[in-house]
């Protein structure tokens, strides 16, 4: 729910047109011919799943997902709400200079999961897990089952290696993005479990406390994370479900979240979506076509702290509960004052249309600023933040109701940035945001997102090199 400067006239780059090949993972979708889903995935690493991964697929069952708070109920809800995948044939590559799912055009659905590495897991077993995850992710992003044999073609005397709920469904633009939390490098008790404490980027630290934080322990942190985005919720759920089974005995879900209705656009080809407050959100989000801005604000560069992270990014996750019932009783003019934009057009209250640059000096008939000094737009705008920008990939969420009948809903905020300081500066600037009266932050996490996997390689390979 941050504000960014609208792009000028961005130059098209590889990835903005579906029919143009691109060199990076996630930048260019392809539409496979009918029947192509049965072919081996060209983008998959050549190695297969380890014996331990296959054991996990055979023995984990639903246990891996049950470890996540509310995960079972959430999965059931997502599957039952699955939209028709007819025509959803977009396929993104898994390997490339950067991981897919960052500058990739934001899909409509999300399943996010944070994991804890199991006690007793060794460095070699962690590496093997990342290799197994990469193999499976490369297959699933191409519309394949998680491993040979799949849901129905294996031994009838053994559990299927694939859960099968994505049988017959296309790839649906699935992207799978991996991240490493601070506690992967140094455990909370100070232990260097995997011999990588000295490779932790200096910036990768637990986020400080912010105004409005009401964090729940079960919605924070994680050694690892996986972000699965797709245009069909069942495809995204299938990905997290099977990756969790593969992790059995090595890692388990700490917490997870389902999201719908993206709350930002990451491509100029996408219209601005609305959040659950009913306002257009992320009007001026960083777009993938803004190549110079993406390089400066999103990707970690050579010389930035840890060399192994060059080409990667930092992911900040915040679960923001909206106090829906209070907001719904607010007058329209109050809602617009809080946001700083009109609810219909999304134009700044200083005048113009949605993409008109806000004029923070404009005053009305009473000599009061047309855009309130505590409005979200003013406080989060890059001109107020020395040019700081974030690339957002947030989603709406509804997790039922609380025991008082109030809607448990809001924004699952995700932003990618070159340095965590960018997010910290923005969030601190929002300390006096008028919106704080209507929201509370209940979940929080930060992860280092490594660069993309090389062909036949695996995500995280640079960290353990």
Task: Please state what every model-predicted region is.
Residues 3, 48, 53-74, 79-465:
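Long, histidine/aromatic-enriched segments associated with O2/redox biology
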Residues 1-49:
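N-terminal secretory signal peptides
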């Amino acid at each position: 729910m941050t504000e960014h400067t609208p792009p000028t006239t961005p130059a098209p780059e590889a990835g903005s047109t579906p029919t143009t090949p691109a060199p990076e993972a996630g930048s260019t979708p392809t539409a496979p011919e009918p029947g192509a889903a049965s072919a081996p995935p060209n983008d998959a690493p050549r190695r297969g799943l380890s014996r331990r991964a296959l054991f996990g697929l055979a023995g984990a069952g639903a246990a891996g997902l049950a470890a996540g708070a509310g995960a079972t109920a959430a999965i059931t809800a997502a599957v039952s709400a699955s939209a028709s995948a007819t025509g959803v044939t977009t396929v993104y590559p898994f390997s490339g200079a950067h991981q897919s799912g960052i500058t990739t055009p934001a899909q409509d659905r999300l399943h996010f999961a944070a994991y804890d590495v199991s006690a007793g897991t060794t460095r070699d077993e962690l590496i093997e897990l990342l290799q197994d995850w990469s193999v499976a992710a490369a297959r699933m992003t191409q519309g394949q089952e998680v491993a040979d044999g799949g849901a129905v073609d294996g031994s009838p005397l053994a559990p299927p290696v694939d859960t099968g709920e994505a049988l017959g469904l296309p790839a649906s633009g699935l992207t799978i993005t991996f991240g490493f939390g601070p506690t992967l490098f140094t455990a909370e008790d100070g232990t260097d479990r995997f011999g990588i404490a000295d490779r932790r980027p200096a910036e990768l630290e637990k986020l400080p406390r912010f105004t409005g934080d009401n964090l729940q322990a079960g919605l924070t942190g994680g050694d690892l994370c996986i972000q699965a985005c797709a245009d069909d919720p069942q495809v995204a759920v299938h990905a997290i479900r099977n990756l969790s089974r593969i992790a059995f005995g090595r890692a388990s879900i700490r917490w997870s979240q389902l999201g719908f209705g993206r709350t930002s656009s990451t491509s100029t080809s996408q219209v601005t979506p609305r959040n659950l407050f009913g306002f257009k959100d992320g009007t001026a989000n960083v777009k993938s076509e803004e190549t110079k801005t993406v390089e400066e604000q999103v990707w970690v560069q050579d010389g930035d702290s840890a060399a192994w992270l060059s080409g990667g990014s930092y992911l900040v996750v915040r679960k923001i509960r909206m106090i829906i019932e209070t907001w719904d009783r607010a007058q329209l003019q109050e809602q617009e004052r809080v946001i700083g934009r009109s609810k219909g057009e999304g134009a700044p209250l200083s005048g113009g249309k949605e993409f008109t640059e806000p004029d923070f000096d404009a005053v009305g008939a009473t000599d009061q600023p047309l855009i309130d000094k505590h409005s979200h737009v003013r406080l989060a705008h890059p001109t107020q933040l020395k040019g700081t920008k974030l690339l957002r990939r947030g989603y709406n969420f509804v997790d039922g109701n609380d025991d008082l009948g109030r809607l448990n809903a809001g924004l699952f905020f995700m932003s990618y940035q070159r340095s965590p300081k960018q997010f910290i500066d923005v969030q601190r600037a929002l300390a006096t945001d008028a919106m704080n009266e209507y929201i509370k932050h209940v979940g929080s996490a930060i992860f280092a997102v490594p660069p993309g996997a090389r062909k036949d390689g695996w995500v995280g390979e640079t960290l353990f090199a």
